[in-house]
UniProtKB/Swiss-Prot annotation:
SMART domains recorded: Haemolytic (SM01234)
Name of the featured protein: Putative membrane protein insertion efficiency factor
NCBIfam families in alphabetical order: membrane protein insertion efficiency factor YidD
Localization, UniProt: Cell membrane
Keyword Transmembrane: no
GO cellular component: plasma membrane
Source organism of the structure: Bifidobacterium longum subsp. infantis (strain ATCC 15697 / DSM 20088 / JCM 1222 / NCTC 11817 / S12)
Similarity comment text for this entry: Belongs to the UPF0161 family.
Major site of localization recorded for this protein: membrane
Short name of one Pfam family: YidD
Length: 105
């Protein structure tokens, strides 16, 4: 049940990317974009936990936010951006995928 719900949620995000987002100019302040973040969070943590992270990301994406690189956390925590959290991760200057590729060289 959870896997099928996850697939439905990912399908909804992909539908948004193809039908709505494709017809508007790029305006996301974050990398990866909010929709790509949602897909990665859903794939990594499932429908419920990934959905929670996606909603929290959408709440952070507002006109007065700084934006920047905001990868899906390596360990699940809704508090990963707070310094007092055990799962705290500092925002990166380079995307995580780039950092991992350079480490493999």
């Amino acid at each position: 049940m959870t896997a099928s719900f996850k697939a439905v949620m990912i399908g909804g995000v992909r539908w948004y990317q193809q039908r709505i987002s494709a017809n508007t100019p790029p305006c996301c302040k974050y990398y990866p974009t909010c929709s790509n973040y949602a897909i990665e969070a859903l794939e990594r943590y499932g429908a419920f936990k990934g959905g929670v992270l996606a909603v929290l990301r959408l709440l952070r994406c507002r006109p007065w936010s700084r934006g920047g690189i905001d990868d899906v956390p390596q360990r699940y925590s809704i508090f990963y951006r707070f310094s007092w959290s055990k799962a705290h991760e500092e925002p990166r200057l380079t995307p995580l995928a780039t950092t991992q590729r350079e480490a493999q060289r």
